[in-house]
Amino acid sequence: YTAKGGNVCFVAGTQVETADGSTAIENIKEGDRVFAANPETGEVAYKKVVRKFVNETNELVEVTVNGETIKSTPSHPFYVPQKGWTSAISLRAGDILVLSNGEYVIVEQIQHELLESPIKVYNFEVEDFHTYYVSANADSDEFVLVHNRCGYKPLRQNDYKAVINPDETEAPHAHIFKKASNIGR
């Protein structure tokens, strides 16, 4: 499946932890089993790839951990235990990422890169957990947890209205309203 835009993807050469060992993301196929996790329950398992995406982008974020640089599109979600799912562009040096062995690694550097011309980038949908682990190179044994973002849509500011603490006599809270469209049509 090919689409333009490269919303949430990784560059060719990014390694994915699979049941058959480390595999370059561009070589992942439907039916392959990738190591996945549910960070809410702590459950980990090999899960099947159900769909592959090839996109194009001219914008990347370089996430450096232990001297290795993982290159993704800016909106690709990484799991930060203290923050939850965090887009690559929102990561900061000092953020902690989860490794496939259950340990943690610290983000050393984030760099935003604009390319002169678009390049191919890759992603895929994983059954159940919708997550997988990536690394910068095949020799690494440190794979970080990322979300495939399929079936997951973040709130877009222009689609919603938030009313924060409308009654000051209550504990702090917010009401989120989806903006109506096409009323009366």
What residues fall within each predicted segment?
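Metal-centered catalytic cores of metalloenzymes
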Residues: 105, 149-185
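HINT superfamily self-processing domains
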Residues: 1-150
